[in-house]
């Protein structure tokens, strides 16, 4: 089986006597309140989804990730995973200290941060290098600008897993997915990341990929997305419909990806691929404008970025697909690589156009969206 990124699967979950000891000591520690995105990141670090990270980046790691897409030791990592606090909060913390991490929604202790460093950064520099723009209209840049100014670096120890009340059948840790992949006997597995409901173009890409590997690992993102994106519960239902009716169940598995969208385009494509590698995938589908937003990135920038690295240091093989469509003359799904006909013969709808139709209670063309899926989406969008 493919090794996790960095060579081993990180596990920062503490149990038994060590856990009880940390809980007792936590009462004397300074406290920091985390929002849902921050606590989700803590959980993902602890379970190994973000391997090789063991905590939030120190300044040396942060600067190298921002500038070179590498950690301080040279390991490829493309998105800075950081924890920001106010200057007032930071003044009450000392480097070398343990800090209790609490969830703002229930005031419960979830983890301990072993604080190594307090530091500042230049948000505009981060925005320009990570997102390719300093415009606040970009949702990822907006989050960087509103983040508290002092960053805390250090390893974490997880006391309690983050509790979810949705999609629990599809919430598996990398250790659990790797065990399932072993049980299925899959030697090669292709991962597919999406924040959209399933449509025929994605189905076409997935099935093309499945022709060449043992298993398909569908991984819908269920963390924070833009308000205009279709809600996660509706998206998951759309996948359940097609998995039940149109996919070989013994060659597919669906595991939700519990992380927020950064909309970092090419850099996020690398990040998404590395996380699927940690789940046990050997291949990863990269389509048009992966993790993009608006017109900030070129159509295939997210594919080209993989060429900047030695394939061995990425470790997971990108499968690069052009955008696909229904061709009336071909009589089926195709792409620019396989179809000789003009755009006049192609049926393709943007996500914006599809969402508009669904909100109006209208079904998109059956060539682009299966009627069974359209019904689920219309019902969900009109609730």
UniProtKB/Swiss-Prot annotation:
It is an enzyme of class 2 (transferase). Keywords: ATP-binding, Nucleotide-binding, Nucleotidyltransferase, Transferase. It comes from the Bacteria. CDD domains: ATPS. Pfam families: ATP-sulfurylase, PUA_2. Its EC number is 2.7.7.4. Gene3D superfamilies: HUPs (3.40.50.620), Sulfate adenylyltransferase (3.10.400.10). InterPro entries: ATP-Sase_PUA-like_dom, PUA-like_sf, Rossmann-like_a/b/a_fold, SO4_adenylyltransferase_pro, Sulfurylase_cat_dom, Sulphate_adenylyltransferase. The keyword Hydrolase does not apply. GO terms for biological process: hydrogen sulfide biosynthetic process; sulfate assimilation. It catalyses: sulfate + ATP + H(+) = adenosine 5'-phosphosulfate + diphosphate. Signal peptide: none annotated. Pathway: Sulfur metabolism; hydrogen sulfide biosynthesis; sulfite from sulfate: step 1/3. GO terms for molecular function: ATP binding; sulfate adenylyltransferase (ATP) activity. Belongs to the sulfate adenylyltransferase family. PANTHER family: PTHR43509, SULFATE ADENYLYLTRANSFERASE (PTHR43509:SF1). This is Sulfate adenylyltransferase. It comes from Halothermothrix orenii (strain H 168 / OCM 544 / DSM 9562). The lineage of its organism: Bacteria, Bacillati, Bacillota, Clostridia, Halanaerobiales.
